[in-house]
Amino acid sequence: MAYIPNAERYTQMEYRRCGRSGLKLPLLSMGLWHNFGDTNSLEHMAQLCETAFDGGITHFDLANNYGPPAGAAERNFGKLLKTIFAGHRDELVISTKAGYDMWEGPYGEWGSRKYLLASLDQSLQRLGLDSVSYTHLTLPTIA
């Protein structure tokens, strides 16, 4: 059976503007870390996302290293975007971030421009998207 979102979803959540961007975000966002790794079923992930969206949560937050394994959360959420959220992409705010070790070699870590651009390209590929609403860099404390 196809997912039909709650028609009252936007009356149940308060939304606020994000700085001067004009972007409205719900007071609650859904982070897709451990619950969206390969250790959980896609059905469980779909149920979590449907419940969140039915309650007015429109912002889904990911990162290049969310899983396990790293990258799995983006890949799994990408599957949900093609199925349950296929007709609702314009209603979603999708963010991702980078900043942790992801691949071998001198460019798979930390915060260089090269790393951030490569990481974003890989995230978009895993998500099956041309763009995300925003991305940011999370840097571990450098001693």
Enumerate the language-model features and the residues they cover.
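N-terminal binding-site loop/beta-alpha segment at the start of enzyme catalytic domains
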Residues: 1-93
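Structural motif corresponding to the early beta-alpha repeats
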Residues: 84-111
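Short, acidic/polar
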Residues: 41-52, 111-125
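Conserved small/polar residues in nucleotide/adenosyl-binding loops
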Residues: 135-141
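Active-site mouth loops of central-metabolism enzymes
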Residues: 33-42, 104-114
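Generic leucine side-chain signal with a strong bias for well-ordered alpha-helical environments
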Residues: 23, 48, 124-127, 139
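Active-site-proximal loop/turn and secondary-structure-junction residues that shape catalytic pockets
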Residues: 34, 64-66, 98-102, 137
